[in-house]
């Protein structure tokens, strides 16, 4: 009887782990696709064509924000981040850059210039969608009818997902 109880407990534990894995957190790739879908839904709501993701541009964007992941922080000195921006510039050469979102330039507490990731991936809920649409609208960067292409990337730092993108004509 005890063996049957142990076996049942073991099977239930395994089933629970399987369910938790299947219902687990969104991956970076899933978050990226959801963000792109929401950006294009937002653009459709204001009667604009969708932005087409270009793998070359997304790869450049991913490489850029991977520097933050490698450092394990969302803020880098401008000089360090600018090295990554030089590589990004080479990778996106020939594309007509319009604007970017999620990577900011500011002055740190010590007076040095810093670059930081500012756009957290919102929860995959109605509230998260509303938060994202408010950010898209408030930025004014997704409303140009001449923009047709996007490079978009997501990284996880300290358990929080951040995203950035660049928009091109």
Predicted regions and their residues:
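A well-ordered secondary-structure block
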Residues: 82-169
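C-terminal motif of bacterial Sec signal peptides marking the signal peptidase cleavage site
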Residues: 19-22
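Short, well-ordered surface patches within globular domains
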Residues: 26-101, 150
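Charged, low-complexity, helix/coiled-coil-prone segments
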Residues: 6, 70-75, 131-133
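Bacterial N-terminal signal peptides that target proteins for export
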Residues: 1-11
């Amino acid at each position: 009887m005890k063996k049957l109880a142990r076996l049942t407990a073991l099977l239930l534990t395994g089933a629970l782990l399987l369910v938790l894995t299947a219902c687990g957190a969104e991956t970076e790739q899933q978050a990226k696709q959801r963000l792109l879908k929401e950006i294009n839904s937002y653009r459709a709501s204001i009667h604009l064509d969708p932005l087409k993701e270009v793998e070359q541009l997304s790869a450049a964007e991913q490489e850029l924000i991977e520097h933050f992941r490698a450092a394990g922080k969302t803020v880098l000195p401008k000089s360090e981040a600018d090295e990554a921006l030089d590589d990004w510039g080479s990778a996106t050469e020939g594309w007509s850059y319009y604007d970017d979102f999620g990577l900011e330039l500011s002055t740190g507490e010590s007076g040095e210039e810093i670059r930081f990731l500012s756009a957290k991936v919102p929860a995959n809920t109605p509230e998260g969608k509303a938060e994202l649409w408010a950010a898209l609208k408030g930025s004014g960067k997704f409303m140009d009818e001449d923009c047709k292409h996007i490079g978009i990337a997501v990284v996880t730092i300290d358990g929080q997902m951040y995203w950035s993108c660049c928009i091109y004509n």
